[in-house]
UniProtKB/Swiss-Prot annotation:
Natural source organism: Pyrobaculum aerophilum (strain ATCC 51768 / DSM 7523 / JCM 9630 / CIP 104966 / NBRC 100827 / IM2)
Pfam assignment, any one: SfsA_N
Family: Belongs to the SfsA family.
Protein name per its UniProtKB record: Sugar fermentation stimulation protein homolog
Gene3D superfamilies assigned to the protein according to its UniProt record, in alphabetical order: 2.40.50.580, 3.40.1350.60
Coiled coil start-end: none
Leader sequence segment: none
Record GO terms (molecular function): DNA binding
Length: 239
């Protein structure tokens, strides 16, 4: 899983590998690292059940964060590395935009702009000079070639979709970028079974003019490469 040729976004290099043992709560778990049990900070609040199971191989960085000694960076499956450090999502999206893989010609105006009842991830300026709000979501769940978001209910995510629709009504451009971090994904869909409220909010936002993007990225040791844009299917479905 070394880095191949092509444009690469370099990632922070983990210090250690280990074996995941159990999750304690949304942001902490226990792993066997260097022959002893250690606390690991998990930045991604999703359930990650398909990745963080007892015995899973993980990669982590040393850190000082309360009781946790390590910061979870990635999970290594049989033939796939999966990034689980959601603190990097904004950096990844900016890299995609600045390198022309997505929203070509747009420029970064501000990070974490305030709008309505909260903040979004990015404020961009379009080639025509319009303001564009951007919300970024990382996707680590893949089932049968379909990337699904979310893997846990997210009332905050649904609220963001409603606010983006309102932004369009007030003259902004608005975009949702799904960063698909699973190499077998061939399409992207909201996870209707897991969080119908979010899925319905995303569908309404799309109908209101919010633009939806899904970008697949391949992870290597230790970098990411753009793979492709994926088709997005917003239609309701049963699983």
């Amino acid at each position: 899983m070394g880095i191949p040729g092509g444009e690469i976004l370099q990632l922070p290099t983990p210090d250690v590998e280990g074996v995941f043992l159990k999750r304690l709560n949304r942001f902490a778990g226990v792993a066997l690292i260097g022959g002893r049990e250690s606390y690991v900070h998990i930045h991604d609040p999703g359930r990650l059940r398909e990745l963080l199971f007892p015995g899973a191989k993980i990669w982590a960085r040393r850190t000082v964060r309360g009781r946790t000694e390590y910061y979870l960076a990635a999970v290594e499956l049989d033939d796939e590395l999966v990034l689980v450090d959601s603190s990097l999502h904004n950096k990844i999206a900016v890299w995609l935009i600045e390198n022309g893989y997505l929203l070509r010609g747009y420029s970064l105006e501000k990070r974490e702009p305030a709008f309505g009842r909260g903040r979004f991830d990015l404020l961009l300026k379009s080639p025509e000079g319009r303001r564009a709000l951007v919300e970024i979501k990382g996707v680590t769940l893949e089932v049968g070639g379909r990337a699904l978001f979310p893997d846990a209910p997210t009332s905050r995510g649904a609220r963001h979709m409603e606010e983006l629709a309102r932004a369009v009504a007030e003259g902004y451009e608005a975009h949702v970028i799904f960063l698909v971090l699973r190499k077998r994904a061939e399409s992207m869909s909201p996870h209707w079974e897991m969080d119908r409220k979010f899925a319905e909010s995303l569908l309404r936002a799309h109908k209101a003019g919010v633009k939806i993007h899904a970008v697949k990225l391949e992870m290597f040791k230790w970098g990411l490469r753009f793979s492709s844009e994926l088709p997005v299917d917003l239609s309701p479905r049963d699983f």
